[in-house]
A protein has these predicted regions:
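Transmembrane-helix bundle of Major Facilitator Superfamily
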Residues: 2-164
Length: 164
């Protein structure tokens, strides 16, 4: 390979994905959705207690189940995204999180709500880490800092626009 070919190849790689800002927006919105969900559940716990007739000890499993599932998935995220492919794993995580969110809202009993919160935690646990990896891959090195700052801003805004 000649020096000119190496330079041309490097220039192509350094440009990043042509749709990189759309990718960053999608990754930020997915992470924002996960962050807002946490504040929504915390605010809704007293209402869920009344609606489902649950004690504080029972309703705590709504948050605990999500957290446990998330904590289990987070360390496996790098391996899973490498095995399935980062884009597929990221898309599957969004899909699992969103479908589980729907079923959480449709749950009519505490055990069903806890089950769907665990499933939601499986999808949500991967969202923040995988979002950052997707953004990092989509941008050239010179723009990664800016993209991560925009991503971080989006994630930090989540709790402020969510219910309090």
């Amino acid at each position: 390979m000649t020096a000119r070919a190496v330079t041309a190849t490097t220039a192509i790689v350094d440009e990043g994905d042509p749709h990189r800002w759309m990718i960053a927006l999608a990754a930020t919105l997915a992470s924002l959705m996960q962050v807002i969900d946490t504040s929504i559940v915390n605010v809704a716990i007293p209402h869920m207690m009344g609606e489902l007739g649950a004690s504080i000890d029972e309703i705590a499993w709504v948050s605990t189940g999500y957290i446990l599932a998330s904590v289990i998935v987070i360390p496996m995220t790098a391996w899973l995204s490498g095995y399935f492919g980062r884009k597929k794993y990221f898309t599957a995580s969004i899909l699992i999180f969103t479908v589980a969110s729907f079923f959480c809202g449709a749950s009519s009993s505490l055990p069903m709500l806890i089950l769907w919160r665990i499933v939601q935690g499986i999808g949500g646990g991967a969202l923040l880490a995988t979002s950052q990896a997707v953004i990092f891959e989509a941008f050239p090195k010179r723009e990664v800092g800016t993209a991560m700052a925009v991503f971080g801003l989006g994630v930090m805004v989540g709790p402020t626009i969510g219910p309090t």
